[in-house]
Amino acid sequence: MAAAVAAAGRLGWLFAALCLGNAAGEAAPGPRVLGFCLEEDGAAGAGWVRGGAARDTPDATFLLRLFGPGFANSSWSWVAPEGAGCREEAASPAGEWRALLRLRLRAEAVRPHSALLAVRVEPGGGAAEEAAPPWALGLGAAGLLALAALARGLQLSALALAPAEVQVLRESGSEAERAAARRLEPARRWAGCALGALLLLASLAQAALAVLLYRAAGQRAVPAVLGSAGLVFLVGEVVPAAVSGRWTLALAPRALGLSRLAVLLTLPVALPVGQLLELAARPGRLRERVLELARGGGDPYSDLSKGVLRCRTVEDVLTPLEDCFMLDASTVLDFGVLASIMQSGHTRIPVYEEERSNIVDMLYLKDLAFVDPEDCTPLSTITRFYNHPLHFVFNDTKLDAVLEEFKRGKSHLAIVQKVNNEGEGDPFYEVLGLVTLEDVIEEIIRSEILDESEDYRDTVVKRKPASLMAPLKRKEEFSLFKVSDDEYKVTISPQLLLATQRFLSREVDVFSPLRISEKVLLHLLKHPSVNQEVRFDESNRLATHHYLYQRSQPVDYFILILQGRVEVEIGKEGLKFENGAFTYYGVSALTVPSSVHQSPVSSLQPIRHDLQPDPGDGTHSSAYCPDYTVRALSDLQLIKVTRLQYLNALLATRAQNLPQSPENTDLQVIPGSQTRLLGEKTTTAAGSSHSRPGVPVEGSPGRNPGV
């Protein structure tokens, strides 16, 4: 008996917590074991109870009565050793609070051990049978998912536009955009509360969806988590972003009502959250963002440009030395050199000694502001006076580093050099060319820059520039005003010649480019008979050669005063006044009606006799009689153009404009013949003219700007 007692198991009772809210006291709790007792069924060795424990011999069978709630369903109880699996020993329910359990303790163990009393709910029975049907779970999940998607869509549509963007649309948008902006502008006042309400609704819907999917998946966490994440990502995030991103402005005004409803439903929570969000969004943030964009910190193109400059070196964009405009240090700054500098269009010019690679100085165009070409100042004098520093860079320097050097104001032009260690001897610096700030900017914008001094037809560009809508202006040919050695020697300086040509072509209508071309006019002004001087005799102020024009005396010439003073006497009253440089007289002497002047200068099909000057044009019948007197008061330098010279200039201009055809071969002007023609006609006119050989003046002084 003692061995049997020693081998008997001790039955302890234990309360098992069931899965579906047993401890929390849900509405439909599972079965719980509150107590038990042995039932006497009359069988031998039915066991006994001692010290609150039921004892029996191995392989004995006895009957237990269980007490507790929940035994009326299909639950069943069992007794098993610790760590053992479930046993198929079903209890017989005897009511809502009682059940009978027949037990048989097997004799596998040779030592006493304890057994556990537990209750199990079968799959498909008990609380599982009380779960919602699948269609209800599906509808609930769809509703929660729609709520999450709606909250996210309202957030992306009604609250997507910032106040600054709404104001821009209201002021400069289309009619539909302005109407939508006017409806959205008041809603931005409670944007913080609306954002808090929508975030709360979206969070609640997503959390409830996860719990519902957990119940639907049989309380398995992994399928519930994966399913909830996938549905929220696709339906709750991607779809609202796609729809709101395309129709933001159309959906935003229509979604205001739903946004207000969300705020009302969650007002106790949305109001403090909205205040917190508005406090976090500092008013100065917009201004700081604008300043950041203005500085280029938020501009993606800034980083792109820097990346391009880091990948390129100076050697890739430099101008080769043989293509650079440079000056020798021994050059004399006469009119020809200054004209070539102006013609080049450069503001910084390198100066070299002996060979072009030996750059020793830099000449700025502004250094020549006070240089007179007639002084023939040596270039070395100017460069030594200003002594501009030279800026050297190596050929492998990155363009971003060169740009920083230029930005610091050192120079806008750098000399590119490299270390030449080829061959025998010591290494030396070899000059490759020049690089300017313009070259770096062209690399950034990926296009060629043509300034006002450049002509696309004369410039070798690296890239094709944008098409020019307006035609390029003709370059000024300053070299035309330089008198070459083989031309006639004239007493007028190149600067004064340039000023005279500009003044006549732009201020005096009879010498305008529509009548006389600029080249023909320049050729005319260089003629010795046109450039004249009058020496003033102090001892005889009323000398005959002092009178340029006399009242009622016929003349056939035009006069422009270049230097000196004259006295003009007008009318019978004898009104007198003085005039100086760049006053002109005798315009009417050139415009006396004639066959040549009556025909348009630009005509391409003139009549032959219209182009032939009448030999009698210098007679009194076509002479001009001024009603004023012009007398020299000092030494004069003047331009005197006779009518025959003017007619020859008209013929030369027409010959240039006429097409080359057999009918117009007699109108072609042979180079150099114009000067001879002017001289011959002037000599002929001098023999037959009754005017004074002195100097002439304008028909009516009232037409003279000086008068």
From Swiss-Prot:
Residues 678-707 are annotated as: Disordered. Residues 130-308 form the CNNM transmembrane domain. InterPro entries: ACDP, CBS_dom, CBS_dom_sf, CNNM, Ion_transp-like_CBS. It is found in: Cell membrane. GO terms for cellular component: membrane; plasma membrane. Keywords: CBS domain, Cell membrane, Glycoprotein, Ion transport, Membrane, Phosphoprotein, Repeat, Transmembrane, Transmembrane helix, Transport. Residues 318-379, 386-452 form the CBS domain. It is a multi-pass membrane protein. Gene3D superfamilies: CBS-domain. GO terms for biological process: magnesium ion homeostasis; monoatomic ion transport. Its main location: membrane. Glycans are attached at residue 73. The modification Phosphoserine is found at residues 661, 700. It holds the Pfam family CBS. Probable metal transporter. Shares weak sequence similarity with the cyclin family, hence its name. However, it has no cyclin-like function in vivo. This is Metal transporter CNNM3. It comes from Homo sapiens (Human).
